[in-house]
Swiss-Prot record:
Principal location class: cytoplasm
One of the protein's GO biological processes: negative regulation of TORC1 signaling
Family the entry assigns: Belongs to the NPR2 family.
Species: Schizosaccharomyces pombe (strain 972 / ATCC 24843) (Fission yeast)
Summary of the function given for this chain in its UniProt record: Mediates inactivation of the TORC1 complex in response to amino acid starvation. Post-transcriptional regulator of nitrogen permeases.
Keywords from the UniProt entry: Cytoplasm, Nucleus, Transcription, Transcription regulation
Pfam families: NPR2
Protein name: Nitrogen permease regulator 2 homolog
Gene Ontology MF, one: GTPase activator activity
Keyword Cytoplasm: yes
UniProt GO cellular component terms: cytosol; GATOR1 complex; nucleus; vacuolar membrane
Source superkingdom: Eukaryota
Compartments where located: Cytoplasm; Nucleus
InterPro entries reported for this sequence: NPR2-like
């Protein structure tokens, strides 16, 4: 399996989602849930006749100012094609009417936006306001309400323009918030995966970096598998795997398959979409060409012709023999890796399934291990790395265990 540069991190391209409005709500002992202030004006109230109202506060008031049992938890409400994120706070005290103060500073986004990056920010704002109320009665003091309005106005403007905000409330208190993109957890890195660096870590690394990272980095060359890197660096496989997942999370590397001449590849449906991009063509030609004199004659048309000649059932070894003359000036390993990374071609994996086992009792430990993997769920790369054997030897071992069929996916 390959994870492209444009793959699981795509959602960062839309970062940050636009903040449409902010409002501050609280529970009034006489009126119940009310909006104390909002920005822009009329976002959730009818102060301007409802012209700019995104959603009426009455429709969400029970969620924004909930029962005490639901306070101190992040809430998200989706209605009228908008989503509201808040973190209601309940402060218990005999100095308050009804012995409690409940308030919530909420943010509004379009419903389809991924607003996960704002959740930590909303929580922090809520906790800051809670501390300010406990220290200087920042919320319950009616004389300070205008200050809250100016605060939410500045937050709205600064977050949309700069993704961060610093507000000095007085000599001792301030609000400092900043947005950071939230990425999903990276795919689990397997022992047979081959990491390919996309950043020059040697320019970033210093003596304070994690020791395991410093050990494994020199062996990340686009050829070694994760298992092999762990062995060469003399670190545990689990530690090496964690390093690769961290690099993958921060976009420092991508994952590809082990390159072997028995591999099979085929074209994807994405290939025609890339033909009209001249920058892509230049990048491809520069990446897959060797330093030999023959490289001067390499064109993208030649490269694309080679990609088109890949098909189901054709091994890389046989593919090269069919196109001996065309391959002059090209690096086949880089040609395959570029094609898989960019989505031009995909790997056709080979999954062995043991249909009928030979009745033998004197199985070796390696054969017993292999027997447990012949269920059609483990492809050849995994078998070779697990057993530390070549594809040829693994094929011979499978043949010795009984009748097997191979599933190509």
């Amino acid at each position: 399996m390959e994870y492209s540069e444009e793959g699981w991190m795509d959602q960062a391209d839309s970062f940050p989602p636009r903040l449409l409005a902010i409002f501050f709500a609280l529970f009034d002992p006489l009126q119940g849930p009310i909006v104390a202030c909002e920005a822009p004006a009329g976002s959730v109230t009818n102060v301007d006749g409802g012209k700019n109202c995104l959603l009426p506060f009455e429709t969400i008031s029970d969620y924004v100012i909930p029962k005490r049992e639901l306070c101190n938890k992040t809430i998200t409400v989706c209605t009228n094609h908008y989503q509201v994120i808040g973190h209601p706070i309940s402060i218990i005290g005999s100095n308050y009417e009804r012995n409690a103060l409940i308030f919530n500073m909420c943010m509004i986004f379009h419903e389809e936006e991924d607003s996960a990056c704002y959740i930590p920010l909303v929580k922090r704002l809520a906790r800051n306001l809670e501390v300010l109320e406990k220290q200087i009665h920042y919320i319950s003091d009616l004389n300070k309400r205008p200050v809250i309005f100016s605060v939410i106005e500045q937050i709205l403007e600064d977050m949309n323009n700069f993704c961060e905000c610093m507000i000095q409330l007085d000599d001792q208190n301030s609000i400092n918030i900043k947005l950071f993109p939230v990425f999903p957890s990276p795919p689990t890195v397997k022992s047979f995966h081959v990491p390919i660096l996309t950043a020059q870590l040697d320019l970033l690394m210093d003596k304070n970096w994690d020791m395991t990272v410093q050990k494994v980095y020199p062996f990340i060359n686009g050829i070694n598998s994760v298992q092999r890197i762990a062995e060469l660096a003399n670190v545990s496989y689990r530690s090496c795997q964690k390093c690769m997942e961290h690099f993958l999370y921060y976009g420092c590397l991508i994952i590809a398959d082990i390159f072997q001449f028995h591999n099979i590849y085929a074209m994807t449906t994405n290939a025609p979409n890339l033909l009209q991009d001249p920058d892509f063509q230049r990048e491809c030609t520069a990446y897959v060409s060797t330093n030999s004199s023959n490289a001067k004659n390499v064109t993208f048309a030649t490269i694309f012709k080679l990609y088109c000649s890949l098909r189901q059932g054709l091994r890389v070894k046989d593919w090269m023999n069919e196109n001996k003359e065309i391959f002059k000036g090209l690096d086949v390993r880089r040609l395959i890796s570029f094609g898989t990374i960019k989505g031009l071609i995909y790997r056709v994996h080979k999954y062995p399934y043991l249909e009928r086992r030979t009745m033998r009792n004197n199985l070796t430990e390696e054969e017993k291990k292999l027997l447990g993997l012949l269920d059609g769920k483990h492809h050849f790369d995994e078998l070779c790395v697990t057993l530390k054997k070549s594809p040829k030897v693994v094929n011979e071992m499978i043949a010795g265990l009984g009748d097997a069929c191979f599933i190509y996916v």
